[in-house]
């Protein structure tokens, strides 16, 4: 909660005068830190306009169930929410959505994986190219 809140605080501090449209792409781990599901959302509520929930180390849990639970914590009626699997598609959707709203200054926050190159699914590491690689690919860099 604190790290997401701090991140959004910093976005508002740096870009606030530009009235940023903030999109948050996030999931959270399965089988542990259950309170993180609510905390991530709580840290962004009222300031993030679009939430995209996705896979992030679900382990033995269904990633869609985790995403639905996170989605249930979004109490801001003005916020858009969606669940997009797999994670690569969620990142691509967030960037496409930002491009569609090019009348605003957009900030897309993709949190959770960073440069990690695996997801834990059913107790096993499954290769993942990493958020930074996906973002650069989608942006055409």
List the predicted regions and their residue ranges.
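ATP-dependent carboxylate-amine ligase
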Residues: 1-141
């Amino acid at each position: 909660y604190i790290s997401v809140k701090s991140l959004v605080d910093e976005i508002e501090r740096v870009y606030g005068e530009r009235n940023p449209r903030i999109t948050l792409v996030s999931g959270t781990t399965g089988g542990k830190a259950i309170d993180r599901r609510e905390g991530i959302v709580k840290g962004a509520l009222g300031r993030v306009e679009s939430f995209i929930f996705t896979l992030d180390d679900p382990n033995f849990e269904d990633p869609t169930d985790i995403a639905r639970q996170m989605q249930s914590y979004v109490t801001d009626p003005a916020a858009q929410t969606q669940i997009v699997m797999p994670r690569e598609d969620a990142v691509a959707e967030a960037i496409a959505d930002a491009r569609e709203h090019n009348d605003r200054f957009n900030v897309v926050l993709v949190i959770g994986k960073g440069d990690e190159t695996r997801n834990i699914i059913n107790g096993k590491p499954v290769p993942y190219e990493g958020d930074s690689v996906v973002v650069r690919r989608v942006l055409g860099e």
